Amino acid sequence: MQKATYYDSSAIYGGYPYQAANGFAYNANQQPYPASAALGADGEYHRPACSLQSPSSAGGHPKAHELSEACLRTLSAPPSQPPSLGEPPLHPPPPQAAPPAPQPPQPAPQPPAPTPAAPPPPSSASPPQNASNNPTPANAAKSPLLNSPTVAKQIFPWMKESRQNTKQKTSSSSSGESCAGDKSPPGQASSKRARTAYTSAQLVELEKEFHFNRYLCRPRRVEMANLLNLTERQIKIWFQNRRMKYKKDQKGKGMLTSSGGQSPSRSPVPPGAGGYLNSMHSLVNSVPYEPQSPPPFSKPPQGTYGLPPASYPASLPSCAPPPPPQKRYTAAGAGAGGTPDYDPHAHGLQGNGSYGTPHIQGSPVFVGGSYVEPMSNSGPALFGLTHLPHAASGAMDYGGAGPLGSGHHHGPGPGEPHPTYTDLTGHHPSQGRIQEAPKLTHL
């Protein structure tokens, strides 16, 4: 019983077209014959009968072939009676399947038999109706199923391409329209837009408008576009480029003015601002001092002391920082031809640091490569005019190499209201201090 049911089930499942890889039963020769014979609608019912008969014998493949041939003969002999042949096969399968097993358990396996046997015919019915050979109908059945997705797959990319083409066309058309202005970014990188050539009249009008207003409002832009026969986009982009150019020019001018403003402020030393301060500027900027002829005191720069003796106190505040006591300079031979005193600080260190004002807040001053100190016991010492020509002509060296009197100049003490100066007749050459730079310790 169990074996019979097992064989029946195997036969039923063997009749399924899903048992083999090609979609047909293991007995490849079993189905073509009933399929080829069953050209009518009733052939669908004969094939399960044969399939049920072939497993009922429980034989090997040769017996199955014989049974299939017998079924073929029985089915092919009376093709003129399809309804009579179509009805009995529905009923005979129970008696054919009944002998192998007793009747009580038979109803249990039998109901599953028609139910599984019923589904195969519709699945395999479509191929036999299309052609006589099963392999070709199977391929034909598979081909539409396969062709439809492939066709759909071929259609979808084509549709996408068409959409992309339409998008590209629209973008190219829009870019072409906007390229009429020759300023719009092209739709594709390959296509280069032409450079806009403005006429001189257009440039003049644009420059005029930019001169009055760097940022253009839309109404004015529309008006200018109509006036100059340009597009708004062209005018807008021209103004953008012009503003960038203007900023660049302003930045360049700012750099030039800043550098030019610094260099003139440093290079020319303002006269009469103070001895050491001016000397610092002159030394930093390396302004060479051009030694003049021995009588430079008749042509002194502004704020120097080479003026008549009456103007010494007036010219003092403009030449040096205000000293604690007012310093007066006395001339030895003021009446002798009106020649002013020898003033070693006529050019207060504006040259190369050889002369300086020896009275800035009582600090020692480096004069002519040496320090000058006063004679404290002589009161307000006067310069000897007898030695002035000699000192100014021969002994004076503006480069600081002249053999001037050595010594130190001390600031006015509490008992010395006026600074005094040594008589520069003693030509003691200062050893080792001729090329020495001034020591600016008070700044």
UniProtKB/Swiss-Prot annotation:
Subcellular location: Nucleus
Biased segments, Pro residues type: 79-125
Keyword Disulfide bond in record: no
GO BP terms, alphabetized: angiogenesis; animal organ formation; anterior/posterior pattern specification; blood vessel remodeling; cartilage development; embryonic skeletal system morphogenesis; gene expression; glossopharyngeal nerve morphogenesis
Region (Disordered) residue spans: 75-147, 159-196, 247-338, 400-443
Keywords: Developmental protein, DNA-binding, Homeobox, Nucleus, Transcription, Transcription regulation
Record carries keyword Amino-acid biosynthesis: no
Regions of compositional bias (Polar residues) in chain numbering: 187-196, 256-266
Molecular-function GO terms, alphabetical: DNA-binding transcription factor activity, RNA polymerase II-specific; HMG box domain binding; RNA polymerase II cis-regulatory region sequence-specific DNA binding
DNA-binding region residue numbers: 191-250
Record-given protein name: Homeobox protein Hox-A3
